Amino acid sequence: MSDWFRHFGFAEVGDDLLMGAYPQDTDDVAALREAGVTAVFNLVQDVEYELAGGRDACATARGDAGIREERVEVVDYGNLLPGHIELAAKTVLAWLQEGERVYVHCRAGMQRSAVVSAAVVALHEGLEPLEALERVRERNPQANPLSHQRQDLLRWWAERTP
């Protein structure tokens, strides 16, 4: 397992919903597979992958393990557009309804993935978005979006709710 993945790790933040750091190598993907992950929603940009060939090696390992992936590249420390949150949340929610065990990740598993995971929990459990974020944080204390990302979560919710 990579030092990065060992340090930042991942946690289950909902029924069959996990969030955390990005896998950097085949051992990291194997750890996800051992945790029962069957689908991954990736929020990382290509420029964030530190290891040469890291993304390609992970894609191959995911494919070999039968783990599907969808991806929306979101700038680290940046804003999450309502459309990106909606796409990610709907995709993850659909997977959960299909019986998948889903892993949502950004680089360190603290900001972007926390916003998307909170959006999923809000939709799945009928919670207000900040209440959903607190639920995520109870299960993964390092989940801590930046203040503007919390505002992005609220803006997404306001734009999707009449």
Residue ranges of each PLM-predicted region?
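Cysteine-based protein phosphatase catalytic domain of the PTP/DSP
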Residues: 4-8, 12-101, 124-151, 155, ...
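A phosphate-binding catalytic loop at a beta-strand-loop-alpha-helix junction
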Residues: 99-118
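Non-catalytic nucleic-acid substrate-recognition regions in nucleic-acid-modifying enzymes
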Residues: 1
